[in-house]
Amino acid sequence: MKSILLAAAFLGSLCWAGTNPYNIIPEPVNVTTTSGTTKNLKIIHEQKVAGLGNEGYTMKLTPGGVELRYTTPNGKAMAMATLFQLQDQLSDTPEGLPCGSIQDSPDFGWRGMMVDVGRYHYPMKEIYNFVDAMHYYKYNVLHLHLTEDQGWRLPVPGYDKLRTIGAVRPSAPENQNNSLLANEGMYTKKELQDLVAYCKARGIQVLPEVEMPGHNMALAASYPECCCNTKRAQVWTHGG
């Protein structure tokens, strides 16, 4: 999953690498440089101020360190993403980075990526790695596709068959086309709560998706009484 973000970021960087002295992705609204360089990216001053918007921030790079200003916690989260990119660049720039100022705010309020955990139950560690990459490049919506014909990943109190049946995809028949690997798993309430908190601290909103009435074979296999046509009521082992 992370490779998709990295590939998109690399292609984007080719477009503006020549005009962005800090090579920040996405390109900030305004960048100005001053004389001198700095190797010190420690935050020496930060301040909440009015007027920078929900995700806007300003950053000043000086020989003594970094000064931040933002209006909301989301603005600080975006500033930290920029700082992480600058830290990576500094490790490859022994002479230091140019001193200067960065002012930024997004053109689009919704910058989302989807993870299809319905068709494949990804370990939480992989999802956290994906969130870290999203934050690095300032995406702000994690769309979690939690239910599908091929699996159900959302815990629902009192409906245990969603875990024992709906969350388990068996191996596909040998002669089946478009087969999927066997896969099983359901996230716990605590895991999802922790993920939401982790994302919030990075300026990312979690959008959970539960498909209904279509793409509900995992539900139908678990509780046929919830569906009208139960002839195909099984967790699908093929794509679709």
Model regions and ranges:
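Short, solvent-exposed loop/turn and secondary-structure capping segments
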Residues: 79-80, 125-127, 144-146, 153-158, ...
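A conserved hydrophobic secondary-structure block that centers on an alpha-helix together
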Residues: 116-149
